[in-house]
From Swiss-Prot:
CDD domains referenced in this protein's UniProt entry, alphabetically: GMPK
Protein's name in the database: Guanylate kinase
InterPro entries hit by this protein: GK/Ca_channel_bsu (IPR008145), Guanylate_kin-like_dom (IPR008144), Guanylate_kinase (IPR017665), Guanylate_kinase_CS (IPR020590), P-loop_NTPase (IPR027417)
EC number: 2.7.4.8
Recorded family membership: Belongs to the guanylate kinase family.
Reaction catalysis annotation: GMP + ATP = GDP + ADP
Functional description taken from the UniProt entry: Essential for recycling GMP and indirectly, cGMP.
The protein's enzyme class: transferase
Keyword Protein biosynthesis tagged: no
Membrane-spanning segments: none
Main subcellular location of this protein, as a coarse class: cytoplasm
Length: 207
């Protein structure tokens, strides 16, 4: 049978919820076959991050030039920094039959939903907003004012859960990883995704 087109898997949630940690755990699993779509950002690189691995880090001017050239599936400005997803890599990789894993902010996910309505949208939620605050404080990288700004934004983002297909609570990283992998596996078994291939197989068998 023909190769099935890959899924676009969109993981997003509030800043500090642990999206990057869960994503890294997924890709450390030897059974993972997803292709990671690296986002582009204008924010400062954090300790331990690598350009071209965690993000493509760009200046604001360079990022805005790419916006004008329509080179993003989505982009958003969040807490003073741009984040965006380069478009061509995602399309080409899905056409080759690979699942593409996209870790982005909630505003960006809204734009992806418009352009890729058949994508799989997963919201990574904190056990509570207080737990989220503790994670942000624990980073030790931001002022109290910036942390409060992120908490206020998180409240709005939690109210936007209805844009997503699934919600996974990140109460423990390994559990969150397993839940996401199970969701993706089940999505591949949906009738809508496999029916056309089997209809073609049946027609060919009748010839």
């Amino acid at each position: 049978m023909d190769n099935e087109k890959g899924l676009l898997i969109v993981l997003s949630g509030p800043s500090g919820v642990g999206k990057g940690t869960v994503r890294k755990r997924i890709f450390e699993d030897p059974s993972t076959s997803y292709k990671y779509s690296i986002s582009m950002t204008t924010r400062q690189m954090r300790e331990g991050e690598v350009d071209g691995v965690d993000y493509f880090f760009k200046t604001r001017d360079a990022f805005e030039a790419l916006i004008k050239d329509d080179q993003f599936i989505e982009y958003a400005e969040y807490v003073g920094n741009y984040y965006g997803t380069p478009v061509q890599y995602v399309k080409d990789t899905m056409d080759e039959g690979h699942d593409v894993f996209l870790e982005i902010e909630v505003e960006g996910a809204k734009q992806v939903r418009k352009k890729f309505p058949d994508a799989l949208f997963i919201f990574l939620a904190p056990p509570s907003l207080e737990h989220l605050r503790e994670r942000l404080v624990g980073r030790g990288t931001e002022s109290d004012e910036k942390i409060q700004s992120r908490i206020n934004e998180a409240r709005k983002e939690v109210e936007m859960m209805n844009l997503y297909d699934y919600v996974v609570v990140n109460d423990e990283v390994e559990l969150a990883k397993n839940r996401i992998q199970c969701i993706v596996e089940a999505e591949h078994l949906k009738r809508e995704r496999v029916e056309a291939k089997y209809r073609k197989m049946i027609l060919e068998a009748k010839k």
